């Protein structure tokens, strides 16, 4: 399912126009992104939680030359599914 499919599903299930469903989906994405940018965590009970995980700096190798390089620390968004979502999938 891509974003267009999600908008269509939201429009159908919530009986909204595609324009309103698109605004709602965009608002959810922007809200989650904004909270994560500020270092927060988004918990949706039963669905799961979004958070930022820090990955420390580490050494790696350039696959073309074999030269050892330093890979800088990064912050990555992560999603942990909730119990109800896990149960629904299994």
UniProtKB/Swiss-Prot annotation:
User: Any idea which UniProt keywords this protein has?
Assistant: DNA condensation, DNA-binding, Phosphoprotein
Top-rank taxon of the source lineage equals Bacteria
Q: Which residues carry this modification: Phosphothreonine?
A: 4
Q: Name one GO cellular component term.
A: cytosol
Q: Which CDD domains match?
A: HU (cd13831)
Record Pfam families: Bac_DNA_binding
- For whether the record's keyword set contains Phosphoprotein, the answer is yes
Molecular function via GO: DNA binding; structural constituent of chromatin
InterPro entries in alphabetical order:
Hist_DNA-bd, Histone-like_DNA-bd_CS, IHF-like_DNA-bd_dom_sf
Sequence similarity: Belongs to the bacterial histone-like protein family.
Assembly mode: Homodimer.
Family annotation (PANTHER family): DNA-BINDING PROTEIN HU, DNA-BINDING PROTEIN HU-BETA
Q: What does this protein do?
A: Histone-like DNA-binding protein which is capable of wrapping DNA to stabilize it, and thus to prevent its denaturation under extreme environmental conditions.
Q: What is this protein called?
A: DNA-binding protein HU-1
Gene (name only): hup1
């Amino acid at each position: 399912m891509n974003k267009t499919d999600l908008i269509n599903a939201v429009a159908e299930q919530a009986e909204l126009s595609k324009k309103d469903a698109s605004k709602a989906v965009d608002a959810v994405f922007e809200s989650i992104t904004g909270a994560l940018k500020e270092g927060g965590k988004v918990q949706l009970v039963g669905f799961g939680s979004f958070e930022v995980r820090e990955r420390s700096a580490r050494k790696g190798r350039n696959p073309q030359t074999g030269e050892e390089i330093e890979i800088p620390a990064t912050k990555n968004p992560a999603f942990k599914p909730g119990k109800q979502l896990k149960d629904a999938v299994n």
